[in-house]
Swiss-Prot record:
UniProt EC number: 2.1.1.190
Domain named TRAM: residues: 10-68
The protein's name: 23S rRNA (uracil(1939)-C(5))-methyltransferase RlmD
Record-annotated active site: C389
Gene3D superfamilies to which the protein is assigned, alphabetical: 2.40.50.1070, Nucleic acid-binding proteins (2.40.50.140), Vaccinia Virus protein VP39 (3.40.50.150)
Protein encoded by which gene: rlmD
Job description of the protein: Catalyzes the formation of 5-methyl-uridine at position 1939 (m5U1939) in 23S rRNA.
Pfam families per record: TRAM, tRNA_U5-meth_tr
């Protein structure tokens, strides 16, 4: 008869080690060395010593957490947000803005094997003009939670303030919480989005069950008292306008309308500077034919059209193409053509690919633009500006251009999301004559 024994669980005592941090990675983690291995330690900065314990041990690197900080970096800051360290939104409020920008620029330079020529930045606080706050009803307390997810968790941090939001949105937080917490339907609320446009403030409420007439009336009164445009979203497809008209924002001398669910850059200040610098780098001439790939609703396309002879924008989301066409008409731009095409498919047979272009701009999503790089090379543009939200795919796509005889003329770090681990960038490629 076979006998089975439970294996004894191994108990290990986590050893406390003392480390000196010599670098900060782009995600805001302190970097140290111990026994020949790289350690990543959240919460520590260069020039700091600390006692830490290893939480994850891999072959090439390890992760650790702080037990006790023994010294402070001169670039350590007191976080402005009381939720910092618990809320998953920000990772670097404890570091000076200058250190954040230097560490991100250094990471970008290492990846691209090229010096970062400039940092395009704006105000480091009160910059975010869009936020989605999760909502969760707690039956025990009969209270409504409203906030962001905890770091590495689906739990919600009940947010009372958020200093990276534009002041208009941060001031609204307690009022929105009070309003939503008084609804009969607070058990059936998914999330609320707040957007600050030039035209005013938008509030989009996702609800998972029909709202009573009393709740609708209460929300409408709230929107009027706070001067909000209110939209109700019973599902991911339907959007009902309760109050307000088509929102819009100013961008580089143009007025752009958008739907509340459309993607717009959350940092208006950096977006304005980024668009202006892209046009400057491309050196757009009145006779130029310019191609804008992954163009969205025309963030770059329409400003380009104010300077070039003709501009073609290509985008995979039909609603954004329609919005781009509408905004071209509103701004009296008749030299723009938008195409709805999937740029992840074979682009050689797409109508835009038959045209000739002098200059190209592309602003792909995180997956990058591998599918269009060879077509761009065939077009032989003089200058190419690549705007990236993922340095890894940027480095990959850049290889194709470098092999084809292009060189990196300028490389900028875009500080689009201060105090977070997000790294955005923009590169100018020039064709070698």
């Amino acid at each position: 008869m076979a006998q089975f024994y439970s294996a004894k669980r191994r108990t290990t005592t986590r050893q406390i080690i003392t480390v000196s941090v010599n670098d900060l990675d782009s995600f805001g983690q302190g970097v140290a060395r111990h026994n020949g291995k790289t350690l990543f330690i959240p919460g520590l900065l260069p020039q700091e010593n600390a006692e830490v314990t290893v939480t994850e041990d891999k072959k090439q690197y390890a992760r650790a957490k702080v037990v006790r900080r023994l010294s402070d970096s001169p670039e350590r800051e007191t976080p402005r947000c009381p939720h910092f360290g618990v809320c998953g939104g920000c990772q670097q409020q404890h570091a000076s803005v200058d250190l954040q920008q230097r560490s991100k620029s250094a990471a970008l330079a290492r990846l691209m094997k090229h010096e970062v020529s400039e940092v395009i930045a704006d105000v480091p606080w009160g910059y975010r003009r869009r936020a989605r706050l999760s909502l969760n009803y707690l039956p025990k307390t009969q209270q409504l939670q409203m906030g962001f997810r905890k770091a590495g968790s689906s739990d919600i941090v009940d947010v009372k303030q958020c200093p990276i939001l534009v002041p208009q949105l941060e001031a609204l937080l307690p009022k929105v919480r009070a309003c939503l917490g008084s609804l009969q339907a607070m058990r059936h609320l998914g999330h609320v989005e707040l957007v600050q446009a030039t035209s005013g403030t938008l509030m989009i409420l996702r609800h998972t069950a029909p709202l009573s007439s009393a709740d609708r009336e209460k929300l409408e009164r709230f929107s009027h008292s706070e001067g909000l445009d209110l939209y109700l979203a019973p599902d991911s497809e339907i959007l009902e306008t309760v109050s307000g008209e088509m929102p819009w924002y100013d961008s580089n001398g143009l007025r752009l309308t958008f739907s509340p669910r459309d993607f717009i850059q959350v940092n208006a200040g950096v977006n304005q500077k980024m668009v202006a610098r892209a046009l400057e780098w491309l050196e757009v001439e009145p006779e130029d034919r310019v191609l804008d790939l992954f163009c969205g609703m025309g963030n770059f396309t329409l400003p380009l059209a104010t300077q070039a002879a003709s501009v073609v924008g290509v985008e995979g989301v039909p609603a954004l193409v329609e919005k781009g066409q509408q905004n071209a008409r509103l701004n009296c731009l008749q030299n723009v053509t938008f195409y709805h095409e999937n740029l992840e498919e074979d682009v050689t047979k797409q109508p835009w690919a038959k045209n000739g272009f002098d200059k190209v701009l592309l602003d792909p999503a995180r997956a990058g633009a591998a599918g269009v790089m060879q077509q761009i090379i065939k077009l032989e543009p003089i200058r190419i500006v690549y705007v990236s939200c993922n340095p890894a795919t940027l480095a990959r796509d850049s290889e194709a251009l470098l092999k084809a005889g292009y060189t990196i003329a300028r490389l900028a770090m875009l500080d689009m999301f201060p105090h977070t681990g997000h790294l955005e960038s923009m590169v100018l490629f020039s064709r070698v004559k």
